[in-house]
Amino acid sequence: NNFFHYLLLDNLLLVDIYNRAKKLHVEVTAPRAVFLIETRLEKDNIVTELLKGMFSSQGGDYITAVDETNVILIKTLDQAVTYENLCDVARTIVAMMNAEAMLNVRVAFGTVVQELKDVSKSYKEAKLALDVGKIFYAERNVVAYSTLGIGRLIYQLPVNLCRIFIEEIFGDNLPIDLDEETLTTINKFFDNNLNVSETSRQLFVHRNTL
């Protein structure tokens, strides 16, 4: 467990990764993705236990944690894995936590990596997906790094740059309190990656009105 903890946090030298993986009989080369399960409460052991019942180290899957609210699944995958396969894993976790423990969890996952040393990259992507998802896709309980779209770009902009942009656009009339209709429109706009035509179609309004 400590090995994967340090691996995710980039606290191991490359030679140490290979040496410890050999001792622990962990495959160095295999397609893997990191799934981050947020319990929204302080981490409960039941989440870890349920995950251990669903995924086993014999199948190349490993469960660990790096903080108090998130549990991490490092899942070994087939070479022909697809984005939809990853979504199925995430949706299964959400459904199981809800059915077995009545827990409302959010699951984020990173991209597939082929080398053990790159697992930390998938973890960082999953963590970013979780953070961005809370802001731009709050209604989703499954968030993929590869589908963050414009939300990821905006999230990574410096705060000062965002503040200057807002002041230039709105002047003194900052939109602090937005009505529900406006918020719905904005969220739908982001959902469609700023595609005006598709957003106006889904909201049943003319594109000029939008």
List the predicted regions and their residue ranges.
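Cytosolic nucleotide-utilizing catalytic cores of signal-transduction proteins
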Residues: N2, Y6-T209
